[in-house]
From Swiss-Prot:
This is Phosphoprotein. It comes from Rabies virus (strain Pasteur vaccins / PV). Non catalytic polymerase cofactor and regulatory protein that plays a role in viral transcription and replication. Stabilizes the RNA polymerase L to the N-RNA template and binds the soluble protein N, preventing it from encapsidating non-genomic RNA. Also inhibits host IFN-alpha and IFN-beta signaling by binding and retaining phosphorylated STAT1 in the cytoplasm or by inhibiting the DNA binding of STAT1 in the nucleus. Might be involved, through interaction with host dynein, in intracellular microtubule-dependent virus transport of incoming virus from the synapse toward the cell body. Residues 138-172 are annotated as: DYNLL1 and DYNLL2 binding. Keywords: Chaperone, Cytoplasmic inwards viral transport, Host cytoplasm, Host nucleus, Host-virus interaction, Inhibition of host innate immune response by virus, Inhibition of host interferon signaling pathway by virus, Inhibition of host STAT1 by virus, Inhibition of host STAT2 by virus, Inhibition of host TBK1 by virus, Inhibition of host TLR pathway by virus, Interferon antiviral system evasion, Microtubular inwards viral transport, Phosphoprotein, Viral immunoevasion, Viral RNA replication, Virion, Virus entry into host cell. A motif (Nuclear export signal) lies at residues 49-58. Residues 140-157 have a biased composition (Basic and acidic residues).
């Protein structure tokens, strides 16, 4: 009786073909499930639809008048953007601010800069207040009636130095309120392209570029880290350091900078290795303590 010998490579090739066939079948099944995913959900009951869905209607096939369409569009815009007369404006405004806070947290977690987020948020809040809290009608008439008298007074009297100082202080307070919360010390000077400030920051960082700073590590020990380990260009480090609250003001005054706080800030934003090794909660406290100590001097 003759024996039939099978080449092992042929067996391996056959097994590979079987595995590929199984993977192909699985892929086809997944595609079918994905394409039919909308059919697997629970049916929607008409009674459970949102209130806005009740405004939907079917056209009867007749083309509406363009003027009527414009009126409907304007009314819909006012209805969506303005609050109802029967609702409490303060409660709606509080709900709006809560939503704004949630949106800010999401944007910060996604990596966006706080200054950019805050400037956009301020504009949105101002537009919301301007639409939903308009000036009382009596105020505009008073302004018109006092316009002529105001012009005559300007010709006769000029503001004293004390009045100018009070006006400038009020303007500074208004600018500070619009730019952001004062506790965070996010000032508009962080965005200025001041070459002398950048030169001062670069000078102090370059002097301590190789110096090791102590940071809390996740292993309950000490993590030694310096600016060299960032492997970044000095210009990029300076640009990132200007975002640290209070650093621009200290550099403009020629004061000493909290370099450990600056290093921690830049490393957290640009070094994944540093993020894995450092204890973030303790680091935040250390950075805040350094910042408070240097800015209070």
């Amino acid at each position: 009786m003759s024996k039939i010998f099978v080449n092992p490579s042929a067996i391996r090739a056959g097994l590979a073909d079987l595995e590929m066939a199984e993977e192909t079948v699985d892929l086809i099944n997944r595609n079918i499930e994905d394409n039919q995913a909308h059919l697997q959900g629970e049916p929607i009951e008409v009674d459970n639809l949102p209130e806005d869905m009740g405004r939907l209607h079917l056209d009867d096939g007749k083309s509406p008048n363009p003027g009527e369409m414009a009126k409907v569009g304007e009314g819909k815009y006012r209805e969506d953007f303005q609050m109802d007369e029967g609702e409490d404006p303060s409660l709606l405004f509080q709900s709006y601010l809560d939503n704004v806070g949630v949106q800010i947290v999401r944007q910060i977690r996604s990596g966006e800069r706080f200054l950019k987020i805050w400037s956009q948020t301020v504009e949105e809040i101002i537009s919301y207040v301007a639409v939903n809290f308009p000036n009382p009608p009596g105020k505009s008439s008073e302004d018109k009636s006092t316009q002529t008298t105001g012009r005559e007074l300007k010709k006769e009297t000029t503001p004293t130095p004390s009045q100018r100082e009070s006006q400038s202080s009020k303007a500074r307070m208004a600018a500070q309120t619009a730019s952001g919360p004062p506790a965070l010390e996010w000032s508009a000077t962080n965005e200025e392209d001041d070459l002398s400030v950048e030169a001062e920051i670069a000078h102090q960082i370059a002097e301590s570029f190789s110096k090791k700073y102590k940071f809390p590590s996740r292993s309950s020990g000490i993590l030694l880290y310096n600016f060299e380990q960032l492997k970044m260009n000095l210009d990029d480090i300076v640009k990132e350091a200007k975002n640290v609250p209070g650093v621009t003001r200290l550099a403009r005054d020629g004061s000493k900078l909290p370099l450990r706080c600056v290093l921690g800030w830049v490393a957290l934003a640009n070094s994944k290795k540093f993020q894995l090794l450092v204890e973030s909660n303790k680091l935040s406290k250390i950075m805040q303590d350094d910042l408070n100590r240097y800015t209070s001097c």
